[in-house]
Amino acid sequence: MKKYEILGGNLPVVVCELSAGESMITESGSMSWMSPNMKMETISGGGMKKMFGRLMSGDSMFQNRYTAEGADGTIAFASSFPGAIKALDIRDGHSMIVQKSAFLASEEGVELSMHFQKKLGKGMFGGEGFIMQKLSGNGTAFVEIDGHAVEYELDAGQEILISTGYLAAMEETCTMDVVTVKGVKNMLVGGEGVFNTVVRGPSKVILQTMPISKVAELLTPFFTKNK
């Protein structure tokens, strides 16, 4: 990829400039606009195991590959929700674990696969999802962030306590666990839920300020009170 630019503030789009022959991989339906010489091809992106993994994580079983044919090309991918688009530098030894359905697009050298939480309870009770997505290989990947992205660099053994839904991404070297909110009264009337997610360093953690699940929870009463 020659270059990219993220535009639009909190209604973002990433515009990618490709050299002739270069390709971008994206989920079905993610392309917003492109130059006429961009050729689309629907691909499986791997064997049945990877296809099933994408289906389990809430994505389409197939992906689209866009290639600049004969000359340089332009292609744009817009976010599906108000927030941010984050560019991640993926390379050998620096894989990223991201929230389910965060993947927007990437260079062809990036591999998208499912990532199971090692303990079932971490995903079910921590609110981050039993299945997350793993970005590995080499290249630039773009992911969607719900709201504003806040980054922390954790030292080895350093921890951060995260409320349900606010974990957007973390490097693979981080570990994740789930803890219960202390005190029965806090659990029942504190309004913060029963479980929190603990991420332990070393490496980078990316948090988001407006999880879709929280927005849906706040809006639900307005759609149902007249029924």
Q: Residue ranges of each PLM-predicted region?
A:
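Composition-driven recognition of glycine/serine/threonine/acidic- and proline-rich low-complexity segments
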Residues: 1-227
